[in-house]
Amino acid sequence: MSAYYRNNWSEEDPDYPDYSGSQNRTQGYLKTQGYPDVPGPLNNPDYPGTRSNPYSVASRTRPDYPGSLAEPNYPRSLSNPDYSGTRSNAYSAASRTSPDHPTSLPEPDYSEFQSHPYHRASSRQPDYPGSQRNPDFAGSSSSGNYAGSRTHPDHFGSLEPDYPGAQSNSDHPGPRANLNHPGSRKNLEHTSFRINPYADSLGKPDYPGADIQPNSPPFFGEPDYPSAEDNQNLPSTWREPDYSDAENGHDYGSSETPKMTRGVLSRTSSIQPSFRHRSDDPVGSLWGENDYPEGIEMASMEMANSYGHSLPGAPGSGYVNPAYVGESGPVHAYGNPPLSECDWHKSPQGQKLIASLIPMTSRDRIKAIRNQPRTMEEKRNLRKIVDKEKSKQTHRILQLNCCIQCLNSISRAYRRSKNSLSEILNSISLWQKTLKIIGGKFGTSVLSYFNFLRWLLKFNIFSFILNFSFIIIPQFTVAKKNTLQFTGLEFFTGVGYFRDTVMYYGFYTNSTIQHGNSGASYNMQLAYIFTIGACLTTCFFSLLFSMAKYFRNNFINPHIYSGGITKLIFCWDFTVTHEKAVKLKQKNLSTEIRENLSELRQENSKLTFNQLLTRFSAYMVAWVVSTGVAIACCAAVYYLAEYNLEFLKTHSNPGAVLLLPFVVSCINLAVPCIYSMFRLVERYEMPRHEVYVLLIRNIFLKISIIGILCYYWLNTVALSGEECWETLIGQDIYRLLLMDFVFSLVNSFLGEFLRRIIGMQLITSLGLQEFDIARNVLELIYAQTLVWIGIFFCPLLPFIQMIMLFIMFYSKNISLMMNFQPPSKAWRASQMMTFFIFLLFFPSFTGVLCTLAITIWRLKPSADCGPFRGLPLFIHSIYSWIDTLSTRPGYLWVVWIYRNLIGSVHFFFILTLIVLIITYLYWQITEGRKIMIRLLHEQIINEGKDKMFLIEKLIKLQDMEKKANPSSLVLERREVEQQGFLHLGEHDGSLDLRSRRSVQEGNPRA
């Protein structure tokens, strides 16, 4: 054991004398009677590395070896009584036993401390005759006349302990000298056996007659003394400390140690002193000398670690060497040896955890298991074990109520289906890898645009599935064959062949579809209006839910305002091993770090009054100019729309219908570029503010244009007396949507590419451009608004928009990677998605609801086309259906819902107002949390300053103490250096501030 730490670095070498693997070679000899002494380091006294060889280079008992670990007695040695700093020198200035020493540590006054003269944490060494520190005492470890001393010339290499109570101490024989002691091996009537706390005993028994034992036990195997077989089935015999005060003293064992072995293993209870941990006493960490020598006679015990060595001072040992208490090493926190990963639940802690999980509900049990710091496999095994134990208990107790069992099964099935659905949705999620690449290279600001595009794509997929299932498929069953010729120009104009298809409102029938005389009927009027209403209602609640979710995640949660430092420090996933994935993760981390640092820098920036005045003036000028440009564009669109109807009557060219969409698309492309140039004048410090301003200006422009067009459609086209004005409006919306898509593609592949050529080759000072988030996001909002308006007049618009968004994602991604550079000012866009959805909800979606409400409640449908032909208003189809339901008592609740909710035009406006009020309340809650977080942050900073002040005061007091008592620091310095020599390469975290400062000052190279 004494060579454990000294030879720890060489235990992996099979040729090293103390290599643990060499011990296994002798196991075959140990199992035989009278086995011969094989040449090796274990039992060869002449081997150079053996402990009993007095001339061994590594022997601790070699008196002339300068590096010996025995007690040195050279001048200025700690064991030399003439040394000024020794503890046994009564006249030493630093003597801790000197009552006049000003820095003498006070002695604890509790009774238990006085009853243990060998208590290691005692600051005052006992000087009674039996004390080890008394050099005149024969049993003292510092006495050279002691028979078992390491420095005794006639007893080299003895491993017999020299503390009082050891076998070779005649004055204090202890319990081992008593042949009738219950724990003695010479007492054949006792059924106990010894426990070896260390593995360095090499399996050699130390009782008399061990060499001639007929049946020598195997190495580290079963005990061989008489009556040992009776106790082989004791559950915790080899793993518990056997002294009497193990539970109240210094016990490293488990808190649930069985009580069955307390009365059996009592051999060491009478000789085991009480020790405190090194880290419990700040002064005890400075003592480098061992109160007891290391040569304790030991027997074998079951090994727990992978090297075959029991750790010195390991829990469960009968004797704990205070020299190794608190040392760093693979020592477990519990007394039992460590179990394998698959058998951890068999430990007392695992059984306790299982017992605590059984009475929990299913939801609480899942949360508790999920919070366990274990691997997924261990969590699954734990869940299976708990379910198995719970099923066993349920058979023993009374059966639960039928309703409770039903509710539990329903909740369990719901959780499983929810988890399965979540896994399926995650597996089919689009563009996960592409989005990670975009976020890693361009940051979260650019990534927010592509996330918004994907969200809109999912939205349109749902709308198309709904329309296709309840409107288009039933119409296919009664549709007539289209006799018009397809030329290909219909893709751009939307007229001709597409007019007599399911694409437009005028193609649908107004009759009730019924197959057979006794088959169920299908009312197309109700199906058409209810499907459109269900689609818009679903969009409404989806927008509310998404906006609330993003608002909660990005505004209310306090971790958003913590700077993300914790995430940046602890976010690395060590399961990522693929090279590309690792590089992508590194890019994401570096981008997030730059975003956090830029925000911290921008928050701390302050401007002077003149700078604020200049910027405010620039902002006012930019807003006036942008508002004037938007008003001029809206006026131009209005006059062009009024002229367009007359223009189409006089021109029969199929391309004439593209005039209005072409002009509107040119305005939508050119004006946002002009708005983006205002950044050169405004110069916002925070890029987020710049994006917000551009979004507000662009949304004002685009929604104003859409409002002008809606006014033109509802007041000019609807009242123009055309044969099917609903189809004309649907064709106009289709052309606007298609033209906007074409302009976006041309701008991506041609305009942005030309800008890249100019910036890289012609005018290099311009460089690559940055991605304009505001302009691109408003293109998506503009297109989606047109889709919602046109879904009533063109049910296939969600499908068309779905294809356009799919193509636009890849085109924007290619253009982004080729023609753009990352933002020069990195900033976090975690709140951008919330703002995008809010703009999509208001004013976009609310404006759509107003437009469709006016269409349904105020306008007369065409008399010769569409499902509502012949009705005075679109809503009259609902009125007639409600009148039919009012005659049936079972459907009166439907009548009430319609008349009080759906029939009220103001219902949607009231609901929108409620949402805005709730949003405002949440905003105020968020502001209050911001203030609280700021106050707590300041409190943490102040507490840190207070601690630094106290540390400085403590350092000053220690410096004053050092100047007043320099000799005590010399002693402590030598003790620390000796500890560093004995435990080289280990970190001792229990050194106090004074010892560390003394070591640094005494050894400047350190």
UniProtKB/Swiss-Prot annotation:
Pfam families: TMC (PF07810). One of its GO terms (molecular function) is mechanosensitive monoatomic ion channel activity. Residues 239-250 have a biased composition (Basic and acidic residues). Residues 1-289 are annotated as: Disordered. It is found in: Membrane. Residues 20-30, 50-59, 76-101 have a biased composition (Polar residues). It is a multi-pass membrane protein. InterPro entries: TMC, TMC_dom. Keywords: Membrane, Transmembrane, Transmembrane helix. The chain crosses the membrane at residues 459-479, 486-508, 526-546, 620-640, 655-675, 699-719, 733-753, 787-807, 836-856, 901-921. GO terms for cellular component: extracellular exosome; plasma membrane. The keyword Lyase does not apply. This is Transmembrane channel-like protein 5.
